[in-house]
């Protein structure tokens, strides 16, 4: 049994909070992004990330675990068929919270929580930024290229030596044949 978080329950009992977060997660997976209060968005993020991680595994047990939270079968199907495979190469960080302007009626802090659709940062992007990670990767790449060039040079020189020897033998045979013809 998970221990409840300390502090306010987002304006209700623990069961109300649990159901409200389930509804927010359902809307997030259905629409891709939702606008809600900052507090709700911060409470929703760990739940959504956990559900996406279970969807990435994709087995029956995890599908049933997700069905405990999200009651809509269509949303669960979308989560396992589209969203989970989309994040297959990403280890966490599936959602993004962006602060928005306060709500007009009560001036509550608002935020937009959305699923991240961009791919992770590639090596080319790191190289363009000139980060330490990119420099380390560049040094490793240069070292492997140098080793590859050395191995190709040694194989080329070995092949060249083996092709030169028959050429010299062929010249010797040609001169011997010419001498026989002259005599």
Swiss-Prot record:
Residues 130-150, 168-183 have a biased composition (Basic and acidic residues). GO terms for biological process: translation. Residues 151-162 have a biased composition (Acidic residues). GO terms for cellular component: cytosolic large ribosomal subunit. Residues 130-183 are annotated as: Disordered. Part of the 50S ribosomal subunit. Contacts protein L32. This is Large ribosomal subunit protein bL17. It comes from Saccharopolyspora erythraea (strain ATCC 11635 / DSM 40517 / JCM 4748 / NBRC 13426 / NCIMB 8594 / NRRL 2338). The gene is rplQ.
